[in-house]
Amino acid sequence: MLTPRAEIILRSIVRQYITKAVPVSSSSILEDCGLDICSATIRNEVVRLETEGYILRPHHSAGSIPADKGYRYYVESLKDVELPTNDKFLIRHLFHQVEKEMEEWLNLTVAVLSQRVQSMAVVTMPRQTQGKVHHIELVSLQDNLVLVVLILRGAKVKQQLINFENTVSQPELTLISNRLNDAYAGLTRFQIEQKTLNLNPDELKVKDSLIKMMRGEDEQESREPFFDGLHYMLEQPEFHQNQRVQEIMQLLEQKKLSKMIAPPSPFNRGVQVYIGQENASAEIRDYSLIVSQYGIPDEAVGTIGVIGPTRMAYERALSAVSYLSLVMSTLVAELYGKPPGGKDE
């Protein structure tokens, strides 16, 4: 746990580095934070922050730059930030000026978000949330070969062949399918994965088959996202190296962004922040990702996000992503004739 003085110094380092993109010297910290202490005390605090992993110093005589841990500490202090009222009014006005069509809203969302954060903004088309189990059927084909038939809500049918260790009769398969129907009917893949159930080896094989089929269906539903602001990101000092430019271009060319920005959990209106090594995808572990879902739970859900270097304007990004996800949720609810899930203040 940092002392109040160490917190002030860390926030000063993060703010200055985000703004200037150069290592922050002790004299700059002293001038910025307004503490009634000497330079030697600042240097001692900086050494302690480095030892505890909050900052990095390329050389002992050089200034400080935030580590992922330092950015995380800083972000945790920004959870309740909001856009200024005038900015909210302007955004609402812009959305009222465009046609009431989803693609118009998505294009406007990434344009507004990228301009505000000066980085690349991404938004996915709202789609049906994870498929839900309607019915499970097991059919004996021969010996230990079994056909798993999965019917999802909306009458989508998936099938897969599996092998049991031993021969199982059709009546035994019916008992297994009845038990799994009782346990899993109406559940999503994520809920099935999280549900604790004492299953025998054959039932576990069926469960694994169900999860595999549902994962394939969920991924098939994904569409390539809308994005804007690549030019803002490439103007950042971090992208003066050709290798970094090639990395981000490959992500776009290989169409991997949809999976990378999809939160690995059920619908959540909160803003999620993944900094550097916190990212699940190895390709973006030198970046920060700020995402939020929008839409109608269990019906139509999309994702809004910002991706950029870890030296990101987190305060602007958090407030903008949060508000735009709320605006889009309201618009999607109106489009579907549903009550909005939040208040558009």
Swiss-Prot record:
User: Which residues does UniProt assign to the signal peptide?
Assistant: none
Pfam families this protein is in?
HrcA
Gene3D superfamilies, A to Z: 3.30.450.40, Heat-inducible transcription repressor hrca homolog, domain 3, Winged helix-like DNA-binding domain superfamily/Winged helix DNA-binding domain
Q: What are the recorded Gene Ontology BP terms?
A: negative regulation of DNA-templated transcription
Asked if Transcription is a keyword of the record, the answer is yes
Q: Which InterPro entries match?
A: GAF-like_dom_sf (IPR029016), HrcA (IPR002571), HrcA_C (IPR021153), WH-like_DNA-bd_sf (IPR036388), WH_DNA-bd_sf (IPR036390), WHTH_transcript_rep_HrcA_IDD (IPR023120)
UniProt-recorded Gene Ontology molecular function terms: DNA binding
Q: Which UniProt keywords apply?
A: Repressor, Stress response, Transcription, Transcription regulation
Function, as annotated: Negative regulator of class I heat shock genes (grpE-dnaK-dnaJ and groELS operons). Prevents heat-shock induction of these operons.
Family per UniProt? Belongs to the HrcA family.
Q: What is this protein called?
A: Heat-inducible transcription repressor HrcA
Q: Which organism is it from?
A: Dehalococcoides mccartyi (strain ATCC BAA-2266 / KCTC 15142 / 195) (Dehalococcoides ethenogenes (strain 195))
